[in-house]
A protein has these predicted regions:
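Acidic-glycine-rich active-site phosphate/pyrophosphate-binding loop
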Residues: 25-33, 111-120
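Binuclear metal-ion centers of metallo-dependent hydrolases, dominated by the metallo-beta-lactamase
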Residues: 141
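Short amphipathic alpha-helical signal-transduction/dimerization elements
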Residues: 55, 146-149
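Residues within well-ordered alpha-helical secondary structure of globular protein domains
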Residues: 60, 144-147
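Glycine/GP-enriched mid-protein hinge/lid loop-to-helix segment characteristic of carbohydrate kinases
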Residues: 1-86, 153
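Adenine-nucleotide phosphate-binding core of ATP-dependent small-molecule kinases
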Residues: 44-112, 119-138
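Acidic, glycine/GT-rich loop-and beta-edge segments that sit at the periphery of enzyme/chaperone cores
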Residues: 148-157
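Short, hinge-like loop/turn segments at secondary-structure boundaries
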Residues: 1-2, 26, 112-113, 145-146
Length: 157
């Protein structure tokens, strides 16, 4: 349905991938979306919004957080990084996966509000939760292994 997708995993760290027509777009330097600088080198996206950052700041993992105030704070941090990734890549849709994204419903309204409030002159693409939120990396690795095996089998016969 969508040709150009930005996938962002928010888990222990933060990673991202661009997908065009169902295929990941490899880059020559293997950058990670979580390494973008938000304000200073100490404030990289994954240093303030990853599962590790959440556990470090609040003393508990995302699954244990019930406070709306805390989720608003987390949402502000997620919004900062997502906005910059969206501006840099201009995707049709953003898909969120990973252990923190399992809690999508707890933070997505606040993320959208923060993005609109802080950067109101840009139309945001839809931001959706991945279907297999926590298992996407494993499924992707399995599909890649299968594709590699098929390619190898075709080229050796």
């Amino acid at each position: 349905k969508h040709r150009f997708i930005l996938y962002v995993t928010i888990s222990t760290g933060i990673g991202s991938a661009l997908i065009l027509d169902g295929n990941p777009i490899p880059g020559p330097h293997n950058p990670e979306g979580g390494r973008i600088l938000l304000k200073t080198p100490a404030e990289r996206f994954e240093k303030i919004a990853s599962g590790t950052a959440i556990r470090h700041r609040y003393g508990r993992i995302a699954a244990q957080i019930r406070s709306r105030r805390v989720w608003r704070e987390i949402s502000e941090e997620i919004a900062l990084g997502l906005y910059d990734l969206i501006l840099a890549t201009d995707p049709e849709i953003v898909i969120l996966g990973g252990g923190v994204a399992v809690h999508y419903k707890k933070f997505i309204k606040e993320v959208r509000s923060a993005m609109q409030r802080n950067r109101p002159f840009y139309t945001l693409p839809p931001i959706k939760q991945a279907q297999y939120t926590e298992h996407a990396p494993l499924l992707g690795a399995m599909l890649l292994a299968d594709d590699t095996a098929r390619h190898h089998a075709q080229n050796t016969h």
